[in-house]
């Protein structure tokens, strides 16, 4: 796409299996079983240690040497599923594959079918290999695997019986056995595994604007997913759901509304206005709601105004976050991101192009280091493994993973979003006031 530079660099990001951190909380009565090596298990234990010890609804089936020569992994997986069923009684088990499964050519698809028949509840295979996916795309893979559970028609249809008089009815009415379903209506579905409180806030905002029914995919219950068909308007809440959105367009005929993501006051306002325009609602109250939110953020905006900020690329949230920062008055010197889904992010990209923000897809880290030395940004947003070396070199950093786990959508959460950028700047200022520049590691 014009205005986007591609460098074909390596990903510096978490493995997609880490997406279980928020997905196991979103989908109730589920269990996420990751099939991988000891290395994969150690990664999850290190990255999500608190959740592991909290006895969360995810676990590991560790591949051993004997599995390499086994005809099928089904028998060993069945033992693990048996234990999960006894302890958790799940309605669904997601069987997450890793790059090890891809390399060893393990047939988890057929194993999942066999396990589903054997245990009487869905065992769903999910492709979460880190070979060609980034951290947050694990969510996209899980939502895509959930689509077969999404109904195409509302089971609650109004039945209309045609009454007519029969010659031999003796004055009584007889109902025609043929029933007519109710006329289909348009419905709105927000797509993305955000927290329940975030979806409730967005539903409340839309209800205030006159839209009573707002569904969310995924819902917390696998047996109660929203109807999605050709009468459905889909609005994504996250920038990394391209496979799910493409399938809904192609197979369900749903309309995917392209607008800004509801991240920051500006994005939330345009998000609500686009929905109102689609459903013929009055969006005039949105402007005051946006202005009110911006006023509440003014003290934080003052700290960001004029600051030079650079994204190295990690969780695919970089483009909407960069757009929000430009609205705050900051100068984004580079928005690096692993992938750019131009079709679904066309509005976001257009905003950055208007501001002259360089967008770099799949950035080369060595080239980025050279650009860092040349541009000298005030704040660098990067992955955990890169932040510490940059801090040692005298740069101020923000962990990109914090934006993944924080609630950053909607007007209410805008204060938490902006604080994630302001906090490291305030920390650096406090260190400078304490004379830490004398240590030589901070320039």
Swiss-Prot record:
[4Fe-4S] cluster binds at residues 15, 40, 99. Its cofactor is [4Fe-4S] cluster. Keywords: 4Fe-4S, ATP-binding, Bacteriochlorophyll biosynthesis, Chlorophyll biosynthesis, Iron, Iron-sulfur, Metal-binding, Nucleotide-binding, Oxidoreductase, Photosynthesis. Binds 1 [4Fe-4S] cluster per heterodimer. The cluster is bound at the heterodimer interface by residues from both subunits. GO terms for molecular function: 4 iron, 4 sulfur cluster binding; ATP binding; metal ion binding; oxidoreductase activity, acting on iron-sulfur proteins as donors; oxidoreductase activity, acting on the CH-CH group of donors, iron-sulfur protein as acceptor. It is an enzyme of class 1 (oxidoreductase). Pfam families: Oxidored_nitro. It catalyses: chlorophyllide a + oxidized 2[4Fe-4S]-[ferredoxin] + 2 ADP + 2 phosphate = protochlorophyllide a + reduced 2[4Fe-4S]-[ferredoxin] + 2 ATP + 2 H2O. GO terms for biological process: light-independent bacteriochlorophyll biosynthetic process; photosynthesis, dark reaction. The keyword ATP-binding applies. Pathway: Porphyrin-containing compound metabolism; bacteriochlorophyll biosynthesis (light-independent). Protochlorophyllide reductase is composed of three subunits; BchL, BchN and BchB. Forms a heterotetramer of two BchB and two BchN subunits. PANTHER family: LIGHT-INDEPENDENT PROTOCHLOROPHYLLIDE REDUCTASE SUBUNIT N (PTHR39429:SF3). Belongs to the BchN/ChlN family. This is Light-independent protochlorophyllide reductase subunit N.
């Amino acid at each position: 796409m014009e205005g986007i530079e591609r460098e074909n660099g390596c990903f510096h990001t978490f493995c997609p299996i880490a997406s279980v951190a928020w997905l196991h909380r979103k989908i109730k009565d589920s269990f996420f079983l990751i099939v991988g090596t000891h290395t994969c298990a150690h990664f999850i234990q290190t990255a999500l240690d608190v959740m592991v010890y909290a006895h969360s609804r995810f676990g590991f089936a560790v591949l051993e040497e004997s599995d390499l020569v086994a005809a099928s992994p089904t028998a060993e997986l069945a033992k693990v599923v048996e234990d999960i069923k006894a302890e958790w009684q799940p309605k669904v088990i997601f069987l997450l594959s890793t790059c090890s499964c891809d390399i060893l050519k393990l047939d988890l698809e057929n194993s999942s079918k066999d396990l589903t028949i054997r245990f009487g509840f869905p065992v769903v295979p999910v492709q979460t290999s880190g070979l060609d996916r980034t951290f947050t795309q694990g969510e996209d893979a899980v939502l895509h695997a959930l689509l077969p559970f999404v109904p195409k028609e509302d089971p609650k249809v109004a039945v209309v019986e045609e009454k007519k008089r029969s010659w031999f009815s003796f004055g009584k009415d007889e109902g025609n056995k043929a029933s007519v379903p109710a006329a289909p209506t348009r419905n709105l579905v927000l797509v993305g595994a955000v927290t329940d409180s975030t979806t409730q806030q967005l539903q409340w905002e839309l209800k205030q604007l006159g839209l009573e029914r707002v569904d969310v995919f995924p819902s917390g219950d696998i047996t109660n997913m929203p109807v999605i068909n050709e009468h459905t308007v889909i609005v994504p809440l996250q920038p990394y759901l391209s496979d799910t959105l493409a399938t809904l367009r192609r197979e369900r005929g749903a309309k995917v509304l392209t607008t800004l993501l509801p991240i920051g006051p500006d994005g939330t306002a345009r998000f609500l206005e686009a929905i109102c325009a689609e459903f013929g609602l009055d969006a005039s109250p949105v402007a005051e709601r946006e202005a009110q939110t911006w006023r509440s953020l003014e003290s934080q905006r003052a700290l960001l105004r004029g600051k030079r900020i650079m994204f190295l690329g990690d969780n695919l949230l970089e483009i909407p976050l960069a757009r929000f920062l430009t609205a705050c008055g900051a100068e984004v010197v580079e928005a690096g991101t692993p992938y750019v889904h131009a079709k679904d992010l066309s509005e976001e990209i257009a905003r950055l192009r208007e501001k002259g923000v360089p967008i770099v897809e799949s950035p080369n880290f060595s080239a980025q280091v050279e650009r860092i030395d040349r541009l000298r940004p005030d704040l660098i947003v990067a992955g955990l493994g890169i932040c510490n070396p940059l801090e040692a070199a005298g740069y101020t950093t923000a962990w990109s993973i914090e934006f993944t786990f924080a609630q950053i959508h909607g007007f209410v959460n805008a204060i938490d979003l902006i604080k994630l950028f302001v906090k490291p700047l305030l920390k650096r200022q406090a260190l400078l006031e304490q004379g830490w520049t004398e240590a030589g590691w901070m320039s």
